[in-house]
Amino acid sequence: MAIERTLSIIKPDATRRNLTGKINAKFEEAGLRIVAQKRIHLSLAQAQKFYGVHKDRPFFGELTEFMASEPVVVQVLEGEGAIAKNREVMGATNPANADAGTIRKEFALSVGENSVHGSDAPETAAEEIAFFFSGLELVG
């Protein structure tokens, strides 16, 4: 399997509860390396641009307001099959459907406040990483 990079966002519900370290431990235990990381506070306009693919979905306003409500941690994870592995570690979008031991099963408050975001494909991973990081910030 190829070495990949994927974007991970630790969302406001998790940063507010100081879960960054516990969440990152799960990524590292799964064999993913954190090759870039920063804590930022998105503006509403930035959140709307990042989640623009969902602009016509009914949850867009609630999602973007939530993502701009408090700081988030954006990071790049690297490893063999990193995109699929990250999604496995995160668990199902709805924590009620997530497997035991996943981030969302352990830490998510609801389907809306589900603690983490992860890229879903190589193309979106590249776009999402470039949204937050320059090449100089990626050290692996």
UniProtKB/Swiss-Prot annotation:
ATP binds at residues 11, 59, 87, 93, 104, 114. It is an enzyme of class 2 (transferase). GO terms for molecular function: ATP binding; metal ion binding; nucleoside diphosphate kinase activity. Keywords: ATP-binding, Cytoplasm, Kinase, Magnesium, Metal-binding, Nucleotide metabolism, Nucleotide-binding, Phosphoprotein, Transferase. The active site is at residue 117. PANTHER family: NUCLEOSIDE DIPHOSPHATE KINASE, NUCLEOSIDE DIPHOSPHATE KINASE DDB_G0292928-RELATED. Homotetramer. Major role in the synthesis of nucleoside triphosphates other than ATP. The ATP gamma phosphate is transferred to the NDP beta phosphate via a ping-pong mechanism, using a phosphorylated active-site intermediate. This is Nucleoside diphosphate kinase. The gene is ndk.
